[in-house]
Amino acid sequence: MKHIQSQNCSRTTGFKGAAFRVLACLMMLVSFSAYAQKNNVSGVVTDKNTNEPVAGAAIMVKGTSTGTVTNPDGTYTIKAGDNDVLVCQFFGYKTQEVNVAGRAKVDIVLEEDVETLEATVVVGYGTLKKTQLVGSVENLDGDKLTDRPNANVARSLQGQVAGLNIIQTDGKASHTGEIYIRGNRTSKIQTRAKAGGSSENKTYSFGTGGSALVLIDGVEGDLGMVNPNDIESVAVLKDASSAAIYGARGANGVILVTTKSAEGEKFTVSYSGSYQLNTRSVRFEDEIISDGLEWTENFYEFWQGRYATPQNPTKIPTAINTLSIAGAPKDYLEMFREKRAAGNNDPYDFKTNGEYLYFGNVNWPAIFFKPNHGSQTHDVTVRGSSKKLQYSLAGRFFDSEGLYNIGEDLYRTFNLRSKVKAQVTNWLSVDNNTSLFHSRQGQSMFSTGDTIFDQMDHHGQAPLPPVNADGTYTNSGVRSGYAQFMEGNGQWDKNLTVVSTTGLTIDFIKDVLSLRGDFSYKAIRRQRERARVPVTAMLGPASPFEYDTHDDSYKSRWTYDTDYMSANAVLTWTPKLGENHNLNVVGGWNLEDYRYHRFYIQRSGMIFPENFASYELFDGTDIKVEQNNSDYGLVGFFGRVNYSLFNRYIFEVSARYDGSSKFPTSQQWGFFPSASVGWRLDQEPWMKWSKSWLDNFKVRGNFGSLGNGAISPYTFLETMDINKTSVPFNGASNNYTTVPSPIPSSLTWETITTYDVGLDADFLKSRLSFSGDYYWKETSDIITNGPDLPNIYGASAPKGNYASMITKGWEVTLSWRDAVKLGSHDFNYSIKGSLWDTRSWVSYFPETDGNIYQLYTGKEIGEMWGLTTNGYFASNVEALQHASANGWITNTYNDATPLLAGDLKFIDVDGDGTINYGKGTLEDHGDLQRIGNVTPRFLYGVNLDFSWNGIGLSMFFQGIGKR
């Protein structure tokens, strides 16, 4: 019985255990269900400082995709569990995370993120808070440049900054272009003169010129030589107040490029690569006639009727039936049409004398140009840091194919930059920044300097192929340049630039008083080689024609060596003066030394081996050697004091005392001061009512002067060039020289004085920003040619500080940026638009005859003179009647041709009954009037950026509103 009872007991216990387990599971399910239950949680989001509600703030349940936004009154409602965490985000505020903790009402207080306004901006020899700026400075984040698929940083800057204009003369990746900030700089100005029915381009020297100063980590450099992926920020100093601390070097504005350094305390390796396919916007091959017969008929119709006029109707072609070519077996057009009718597309035939006769269908642009070409970029970056050491190494390889289908057309670059900083003690740090840039460019070229378009247009005709059936070159193949490119005519450029800066920083009082000293050395080694090879055209199997002969051939080489050294010592004092006072004082010394050497060698009349080691080994008949050297130095003492009171009233003065060896001893030094004031109205007590929507409202004004010493090192010296006579005497060329142009002993700096007023404003937690400036710039003591000397003197007019110029302009920038929740990720977007305009006038020029084709007092830079019109003549009868009534007998363009239908109706401005140019002066310019200006007006740039979940899209538009 005990045994049986034991079994029953056991069964009972097992049943109870199973029941317990089931009950436990049910309780767990109930508990889980209760835990997972989402309840409505509501609350109000307010601003910590103003206690105002924040509308449009994003509320998310952390770790989920559940979210909502606040209503106009700042309220919200969201489904959340008792233990969930709410994440609240809004542009211009710090992100807040709040535990629900079982509450049904959760209010959230957002704290303003002052990073946008308090961010530091790179300025000359230091940094300032954005709120302390009173000059015209625009700062760009490096990410704005890396998003653009350009090999050259200068192209990426185009349209990003109001007042910054980068002029590109072509689309080559190697060309940086000329960088202008706020309008025309003094330089060589081209005008187009027209007299007696002929046109002539003339260039007049007007000032020293020079592009904006580009400093890469404090060392003068080229934007085309910096890796876009390695840029931390770019600051553009546009007015005299901002650039005065750079003195003469900053006369045309300053661009400060700061490269990236190591961040954090971990070792990172990153790689990025891209491939870009470029397609020509204009496809010439689609716009020309490539059918040989059609081209011939069109050409001959024009050719046959080129002398046709209503007065000479016998010259008007009635039919295109014949075209005789010397040596052709019969009429060329007849032969062409017969071949086409028979389906014979063989382009080769023969004349009776055995020379070739061609019947091709050649698309010459398709031979010369690729429909598209590619480029690739590879970036590798290594960065790391510890408590005492920071290091980074960044490299880039860029390879771009050229546009041409033939010859060697390429551009390759390699960038490498290393940065190391060691904290030796708590008051001493040392650093080194070394960069290397190497480039190689190959390009086809004509020895005559003509463009491919000129040569191809004249000699690349549809019926004429570039090569004969046996592979030799045709006459068109040679004269178009095709043969030269295929045989090795070309130009090859190499560039190696190494820059190294070593510096030390002593913190006497941390974050208060520090001394920075550095020394930089830059070596530039450039080489250019050019070749012209003998080329022969075969007019027939036994009829060679040497186009470029053995005697015409040459190989040449240029080497350009530049060594640059600079030293800087900068003392910075930023004392802690309490909440109501901010003081930033900078003082320093700068020394620069430039040395330049050029060597040129050319060997003519040689047979080229495929590879050559030295010019001495060439089998040549003539050798030419040239060399020249130059050097100059600059030294400057500078200072800046920036003070703000109550974070409302800002005052700044800066100055530089510059010395340059380019000027005579008595004129080598110049003093260039500036002063600025700013007023932050938003910080005034009576503006508290605007705190909820106005973040910054600053008006500013400044004036300052800068010197421009961008002249050649020996301009102040009267030099005598030695040349050789072109006509030999006694069987040899002799040396000769000419009388030098006199140089005034008072030759000195050009001085640029700028006046600027501006407004900066930020609204809605810096989502909406506006900046505007109006400026007036006076350039005095411009170096240019003086009054003409008597012919008996035998030399050109001397150069001196004779002229002056005025530039006026304005610029505005408006931007909007925001972030909204899209799914579980932020969707960030920004829109930025810039518009600017500038005009320049010659306020004084030492000319007395008022020639409108030259510079004169009152001339607007870029102005164009021409005839004005009043439509076209609709018929020959109207043209003849008009000519008879007004006494106009001839066409202005060609005195031998009467006025005809389609000719322009020129307006007789001076009413003398004829169309003429007068004497081409301001007093007598006939019927000429100012009809336009070549200076770009109303330049604009629009930037659109979007990003979401690691996916980005950037769009950029730029243009000219008027020209």
Protein language model features and the residues they cover:
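Short, small/polar-rich motifs associated with maturation and membrane association
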Residues: 1-401, 405-416, 429-431, 826, ...
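C-terminal beta-signal and adjacent terminal beta-strands/loops
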Residues: 4, 279-280, 368-369, 691-695, ...
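Conserved C-terminal beta-signal and adjacent last beta-strands/turns
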Residues: 23, 381-383, 423, 828-830, ...
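Short, glycine/acidic-rich beta->alpha junctions
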Residues: 149, 218, 237-240, 249-253, ...
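C-terminal extracellular loops and terminal segments
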Residues: 154-160, 797-806, 850-864, 925-945, ...
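Extracellular/periplasmic, surface-exposed regions of secreted and cell-surface proteins
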Residues: 210-211, 419-438, 446, 472-532, ...
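Conserved small-residue
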Residues: 270-354, 600, 819-932
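Extracytoplasmic gating/loop element in the C-terminal half of outer-membrane beta-barrel translocons
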Residues: 460, 483, 538, 619, ...
